[in-house]
């Protein structure tokens, strides 16, 4: 299965280095000069390969690799004027560099959303090591929407499993539980 390419950050194997004590780093766009930079003053969480059609992916990748960090720990530190929201109607407001197209962070503005307060980040845009490694794959079937032939999906899922990234066609069970718990709380069924 090694011939199925997922994403450059995981194709050679998921690196499970030491994350203890890691307190964050700086994300940079891919422009040659006047780079947009975003400081993330926190370890990332829920890092995963995402097959949705909205997330930024490097050239040729079937999946993005995306994690979350607390919103109050994510700060644009250089060239905010180059950022533009990709789709203002989307739940996740993805802030992309107008120069190179890279998504620097995604933010949820709906205070009632279960993930409000968490910003989505691409740790591969950081030169610092120590970020949490990817732990699962989400929205796997969605890569069909971006051009992967359906008859390749068994091979893609096998490769994800081989890499230790359990494939889901939604989010991981813990994140789906968080979404459902939020809905139940808003309905008054849980406190």
UniProtKB/Swiss-Prot annotation:
Residues 22-169 form the CENP-V/GFA domain. Signal peptide: none annotated. This is Glutathione-dependent formaldehyde-activating enzyme. Its cofactor is Zn(2+). Belongs to the Gfa family. It comes from the Bacteria. Zn(2+) 2 binds at residues 50, 52, 55. Its EC number is 4.4.1.22. NCBIfam families: formald_GSH, PRK05417.1. GO terms for molecular function: S-(hydroxymethyl)glutathione synthase activity; zinc ion binding. It catalyses: S-(hydroxymethyl)glutathione = glutathione + formaldehyde. It comes from Xanthomonas campestris pv. campestris (strain B100). The gene is gfa. Keywords: Lyase, Metal-binding, Zinc. Coiled coil: none annotated. Zn(2+) 1 binds at residues 29, 31, 97, 100. Binds 2 Zn(2+) ions per subunit. Pfam families: GFA (PF04828). InterPro entries: CENP-V/GFA, Formald_GSH, Mss4-like_sf. One of its GO terms (biological process) is formaldehyde catabolic process. The lineage of its organism: Bacteria, Pseudomonadati, Pseudomonadota, Gammaproteobacteria, Lysobacterales. Catalyzes the condensation of formaldehyde and glutathione to S-hydroxymethylglutathione. Pathway: One-carbon metabolism; formaldehyde degradation; formate from formaldehyde (glutathione route): step 1/3.
């Amino acid at each position: 299965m090694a011939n199925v390419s997922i994403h450059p950050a995981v194709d050679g194997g998921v690196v499970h280095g030491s994350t203890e004590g890691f307190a964050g780093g700086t994300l940079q766009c891919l422009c040659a000069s006047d780079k947009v930079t975003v400081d993330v003053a926190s370890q990332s969480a829920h890092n995963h390969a995402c097959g949705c059609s909205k997330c930024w992916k490097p050239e040729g990748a079937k999946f993005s690799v995306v994690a979350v960090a607390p919103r109050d720990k994510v700060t644009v530190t250089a060239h905010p004027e180059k950022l533009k929201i990709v789709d203002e109607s989307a739940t996740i407001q993805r802030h992309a560099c107008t120069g190179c197209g890279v998504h620097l962070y995604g933010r949820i503005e709906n205070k009632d959303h279960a993930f409000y307060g968490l910003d989505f980040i691409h740790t591969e845009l950081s030169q610092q090591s120590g970020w949490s490694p990817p732990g699962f794959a989400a929205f796997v079937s969605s890569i069909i929407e971006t051009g992967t032939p359906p008859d390749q999906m068994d091979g893609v899922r096998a490769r994800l499993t081989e890499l230790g990234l359990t494939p889901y066609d939604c989010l991981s069970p813990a994140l789906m539980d968080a979404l459902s718990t939020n809905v139940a709380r808003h309905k008054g069924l849980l406190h």
